[in-house]
Amino acid sequence: MTTIVDSNLPVARPSWDHSRLESRIVHLGCGAFHRAHQALYTHHLLESTDSDWGICEVNLMPGNDRVLIENLKKQQLLYTVAEKGAESTELKIIGSMKEALHPEIDGCEGILNAMARPQTAIVSLTVTEKGYCADAASGQLDLNNPLIKHDLENPTAPKSAIGYIVEALRLRREKGLKAFTVMSCDNVRENGHVAKVAVLGLAQARDPQLAAWIEENVTFPCTMVDRIVPAATPETLQEIADQLGVYDPCAIACEPFRQWVIEDNFVNGRPDWDKVGAQFVADVVPFEMMKLRMLNGSHSFLAYLGYLGGYETIADTVTNPAYRKAAFALMMQEQAPTLSMPEGTDLNAYATLLIERFSNPSLRHRTWQIAMDGSQKLPQRLLDPVRLHLQNGGSWRHLALGVAGWMRYTQGVDEQGNAIDVVDPMLAEFQKINAQYQGADRVKALLGLSGIFADDLPQNADFVGAVTAAYQQLCERGARECVAAL
C-alpha cells in the first residue's frame, strides 16, 4: 500500500539524516496532542539545528493505541500535521520519532529496556489526568486503582505509565546509571508535582530506599502546554488525504498557534526547545493560571452557553457578536484581575489572540466536546476566580452566568426539548437531582455536590443568589438572550 514514505507529496519530507537521531526521550502516550505539540517542537529543532534528540514513542493501551504504533511503523515513523488557519492550511511531515513501541508487540521488557538505556535523558508523558492514578480527594496515588494494584503485584511487568517509570528508575539505579527527568506534558495544573506525587507514592509502596533515591536524583519539571488539537475524525483524515494525495492514518489537524512554557529543571540534559518557540522559565504556575482562567474558563463559558444557544462549534458561537464580546469581557474584567503575571505580560493581547483562535472556523471544535467532564473542570476554571471576587468585592456576573450555564446544561435537555448527551463522571448524581428537583431547588441540590462546590460556596448567600438568578433567567429567556443582556 502506498504511504507518505513512497508517494510524491506536495510537501517536503524531513531532509536530515534520520540515523543521526538518538532515542534520548521516551514518551509515554503518543496521542494526537503530543504529535501536534512536543513531537513537532522536537521536529523543528532537528530541522533548524544539528540536534540529535529523537523520541522513542510508547503507547500502553490496547486497541487504537496499538494500531497507531503499527501504522507509524509502516510509515517509517513519519506522519502529517495539518495546521489549519482561518484562510489556509499548512501541511508538515514530522520526523522526530526514532522508535515506536507497544507492550503487545515489544513486551514490557522492550519498553523498560528503552527507558533504562544510558542515553535516555527524559521520560515525558501525555497520559491524561486519569493516567496519574491519583485519589480525587487527597491528590495522593490511589493504591486501590486496579492498574496500581497490578503494578505492585507485578512490578517487572507494569501496566500503568507510573509503574513503568518506577521500574525503569529501579533498573537505572541498579545499573549505576544517572536518573532521567520525568516531564509531564498533560494539560493538568502543576503537572510536574502531580507526576512526582504519583511516582514517589508507588516507589514508596514498593521500596522506601528506591523512593529516597528518586526524590534525590529525579526532577519533575512543570510544563504549560497549549494548542487546540481536536480529535481526528474520518472526515479530517480524508480532508488531509485529499490535500496530500495519499492517505495517512496517523495524520492530525490542529490550529496554527502553539505555546509551551517549561520549568527549567532537568537532571540529565534537555533539547534547546527555546530555539523553536518554547519558553524555559523558573516558575510555570502564573502561566498555567493565565491559561486555565482566560482560555479554559472562557472556553467552558462558550461551550455551555453556546451549546444551549444552538451552536455546534466554538467558532460558530463567536460569530455571534454578543458571545464574542461576553467572552472577551469575562477574560479581561473578571479573570485577568485574579492573576499575578511576570512583568511584561500583556493580558489584553493574550485575550485578543484567544478570541482570534476561537474564531478559526476550520477547526470545528465542538461545544459538546468542551462541555464534557464539567464537574472536574468547573472548580479550577470558574469557581476559584469567583472565590477571589467574593473576597475582594470584584464583579463576576459573567462567571455567574457560566456556572448557571453548566447547571442548565446538566439538565440533559436543550432549549428545544432535545436530549443532551451529558458526559461526566458525576452523571448519575445529576440524573438523580434532575428526577427530584427543578428551578431554585435544583440549583440548591447541585450546590450540595461538595466535590464541585466544596463547603464554602453553598454557604455564601451572594454566590447562591447570583447563580440562582442567572439559572432562572436562562430557563426563562434562553442562552442567547442572557448572553446579549450581560
Swiss-Prot record:
Example of a GO MF term: fructuronate reductase activity
Reactions this protein catalyses: D-mannonate + NAD(+) = keto-D-fructuronate + NADH + H(+)
Major enzyme class: oxidoreductase
GO biological process, one term: D-glucuronate catabolic process
Chain positions recorded as NAD(+) binding sites: I25, V26, H27, L28, G29, C30, G31, A32, F33, H34, R35, A36
Keyword Oxidoreductase in record: yes
Keywords of the record: NAD, Oxidoreductase
EC number: 1.1.1.57
Pfam families: Mannitol_dh, Mannitol_dh_C
Gene3D superfamilies documented for this protein: N-(1-d-carboxylethyl)-l-norvaline Dehydrogenase, domain 2, NAD(P)-binding Rossmann-like Domain
InterPro entries with a match to the protein in the record: 6-PGluconate_DH-like_C_sf (IPR008927), 6PGD_dom2 (IPR013328), Mannitol_DH (IPR000669), Mannitol_DH/Oxidoreductase (IPR050988), Mannitol_DH_C (IPR013118), Mannitol_DH_CS (IPR023027), Mannitol_DH_N (IPR013131), NAD(P)-bd_dom_sf (IPR036291)
SUPFAM superfamilies: 6-phosphogluconate dehydrogenase C-terminal domain-like, NAD(P)-binding Rossmann-fold domains
Highest taxon in the source lineage: Bacteria
Pathway terms, separated by semicolons: Carbohydrate metabolism; pentose and glucuronate interconversion
Stored PROSITE patterns: MANNITOL_DHGENASE
Membrane-crossing residue ranges in chain numbering: none
Family from the record: Belongs to the mannitol dehydrogenase family. UxuB subfamily.
Name recorded for this polypeptide: D-mannonate oxidoreductase
Record organism: Escherichia coli (strain K12)
Organism taxonomic ancestry: Bacteria, Pseudomonadati, Pseudomonadota, Gammaproteobacteria, Enterobacterales
